[in-house]
Amino acid sequence: MSTIKIKQVKSRIGAPADQKRTLDALGLRKLNRVVEHESTSSILGMVDKVKHLVAIVK
């Protein structure tokens, strides 16, 4: 499978608890951090849930 790089571009402050847990599950705990994951349906679903807080880096 292909991999995607995900970068946190907005702060989690003020976000609902479920979105904070999603960021934790993705491995994003600080602003401007980049993590790499395989492009599975579960990862893409998590990215879609917090799409206003993250960006896909190419």
Curated annotation (Swiss-Prot):
Alphabetical UniProt keywords: Ribonucleoprotein, Ribosomal protein
Quaternary structure, from the entry: Part of the 50S ribosomal subunit.
Domain of life (superkingdom): Bacteria
One Gene Ontology cellular component annotation held by this UniProt entry: cytosolic large ribosomal subunit
Family note: Belongs to the universal ribosomal protein uL30 family.
TM annotation in the entry: none
Protein name as it appears in the record: Large ribosomal subunit protein uL30
Gene3D superfamilies referenced in this protein's UniProt entry, alphabetically: Ribosomal protein L30, ferredoxin-like fold domain
Gene Ontology terms describing biological process: translation
Taxon lineage: Bacteria, Pseudomonadati, Bacteroidota, Bacteroidia, Bacteroidales
Organism: Bacteroides thetaiotaomicron (strain ATCC 29148 / DSM 2079 / JCM 5827 / CCUG 10774 / NCTC 10582 / VPI-5482 / E50)
NCBIfam families per UniProt: rpmD_bact (TIGR01308)
InterPro entries: Ribo_uL30_ferredoxin-like_sf (IPR036919), Ribosomal_uL30_bac-type (IPR005996), Ribosomal_uL30_ferredoxin-like (IPR016082)
MF terms (GO), sorted A to Z: structural constituent of ribosome
